[in-house]
Curated annotation (Swiss-Prot):
Protein species of origin: Prochlorococcus marinus (strain MIT 9515)
PANTHER family: UNDECAPRENYL-DIPHOSPHATASE (PTHR30622:SF4)
Entry's transmembrane regions: 1-21, 39-59, 86-106, 117-137, 153-173, 190-210, 216-236, 246-266
Lineage, uppermost ranks: Bacteria, Bacillati, Cyanobacteriota, Cyanophyceae, Synechococcales
Function text: Catalyzes the dephosphorylation of undecaprenyl diphosphate (UPP). Confers resistance to bacitracin.
Membrane topology: Multi-pass membrane protein
Similarity annotation: Belongs to the UppP family.
Biological process, per Gene Ontology: cell wall organization; peptidoglycan biosynthetic process; regulation of cell shape; response to antibiotic
Miscellaneous comment as given in the Swiss-Prot or TrEMBL entry: Bacitracin is thought to be involved in the inhibition of peptidoglycan synthesis by sequestering undecaprenyl diphosphate, thereby reducing the pool of lipid carrier available.
Name the record gives this protein: Undecaprenyl-diphosphatase
GO molecular function, one term: undecaprenyl-diphosphatase activity
UniProt-annotated location(s): Cell inner membrane
Length: 266
């Protein structure tokens, strides 16, 4: 039973981490729908490691080529690379806000923000934000010509994804589009920005909830991570291809309906 449960968590986490619909919200709501225990923020953060590994694997050529073109990873030329500077700048807001949340919200897993009502309202609000982002014009910014302030704004939007229902990819892609980014590069930067933010979330949860992790069965958890990895690869490939030519419309409609259905079932 543990294996099936963790495979279930892995599939939901992997698909919804990168498709802009909120992985945390779907883990909670779909778990309730199928009568499976809500994994909570700690387990959710740990199985997200599979998603981080998927980003590395999918963009391995881009990452390694960038590293090779800027000498070795510990040399100054590496840190002068624009994309790595942008990722660093974009990660600062979630580190600050995430740290504040950890300090002052002692039981975030059971807070109002993880309630079904909050998830529903946030999902509906995000559908409106994504709609505005999708219809915005002048998409001329890309990974090569973007400004560091663009990275900061996208990073600030990512910090709000701490709230279940926001969606890290939904928030970052929307902010990028509103800032004038090209659709494909908006999604690509969102995924690359997820490497440090998701990794840090998993690390912090591990350190602060180490006693809780000792209760998780190792083999089912490992299977869950593998499942997350492969489902994340599918989601990344799908979203990059879909968004570049179709935009966010299907996800906007889905999020609106998702939020309304939750409210109707409260």
């Amino acid at each position: 039973m543990d294996f099936l449960k963790f495979i279930f968590y892995g599939i939901i986490q992997g698909l919804t981490e990168f498709i802009p619909v909120s992985s945390t919200a779907h883990l909670k709501i779909i778990s309730q729908l199928f009568g499976v225990k809500d994994p909570g923020s700690s387990l959710s953060a740990i199985i997200q490691i599979g998603s981080v590994l998927a980003i590395f694997w999918y963009f391995r050529k881009y990452i390694f080529n960038t590293i090779n073109s800027n000498s070795k990873i510990l040399r100054p030329s590496f840190f002068s690379n624009k994309i790595y500077k942008s990722i660093f700048i974009g990660t600062i807001p979630i580190v600050l806000i995430g740290g504040i949340v950890k300090l002052f919200v002692t039981d975030f897993s059971n807070s109002f923000f993880r309630s079904n009502f909050s998830i529903a309202v946030v999902s509906i609000l995000m559908s409106l934000i994504m709609f505005l982002a999708d219809i915005s014009t002048n998409k001329f910014i890309n990974l090569s010509n973007h400004k560091y302030r663009n990275s900061l704004f996208i990073g600030i939007s990512q910090a709000f994804a701490i709230i279940p229902g926001v969606s890290r990819s939904g928030a970052t892609i929307s902010m990028a589009l509103l800032s004038g980014w090209d659709r494909k590069d908006a999604a690509k930067f969102s995924f690359l920005l997820g490497i440090p933010s998701i990794s840090l979330a998993a690390f912090v949860e591990f350190i602060t909830s180490i006693n809780e992790f000792s209760t998780f069965p190792f083999l089912p958890l490992f299977v869950g991570l593998i499942t997350t990895f492969f489902s994340s690869l599918l989601a990344i490939d799908f979203l990059l291809k879909y968004v570049s030519s179709n935009g966010l419309k299907i996800f906007i409609y889905y999020r609106l309906v998702f939020g309304i259905l939750i409210i109707l079932n409260l």
